[in-house]
From Swiss-Prot:
Pfam family for this entry, one: Ribosomal_S20p
Keywords attached to this entry: Ribonucleoprotein, Ribosomal protein, RNA-binding, rRNA-binding
Superkingdom of origin organism: Bacteria
PANTHER family reported for this sequence: 30S RIBOSOMAL PROTEIN S20 (PTHR33398), SMALL RIBOSOMAL SUBUNIT PROTEIN BS20C (PTHR33398:SF1)
Gene (name only): rpsT
Protein known as: Small ribosomal subunit protein bS20
Composition-biased stretches (Basic residues): 16-26
């Protein structure tokens, strides 16, 4: 543990941020998983609804710096392609 008062405060705020960020990352994973489950079930409308709910959340987390913009783009691109493939099957 830190000895200097400012260092102690930094350690506490760092811990608070870590907990909040891990919760937010978990939320992102949950939303992506919901879309993947909907895709696997073959229900296009459910998959599209889940995708529409996921997109703004991922975008807001990119703006906050929680995930990299390329990772968010990759998530959205891959999942949208998989949703489009549902109708072709």
């Amino acid at each position: 543990m830190a000895n200097i008062k400012a260092s102690k405060k930094d350690a506490l705020t760092s811990e608070k941020r870590r907990k909040k960020n891990s919760s937010r990352r978990s939320m992102i994973r949950t939303f992506v998983k919901k879309v993947r489950v909907a895709i696997m079930s073959g229900n296009k409308t459910t998959a599209e609804d889940a995708f529409k709910k996921m997109q703004p959340i991922i975008d807001s987390h990119v703006n906050k710096g929680l995930i990299h913009k390329n990772k968010a783009a990759r998530y959205k691109s891959n999942l949208s392609l998989q949703i489009k493939k549902i109708s072709k099957i």
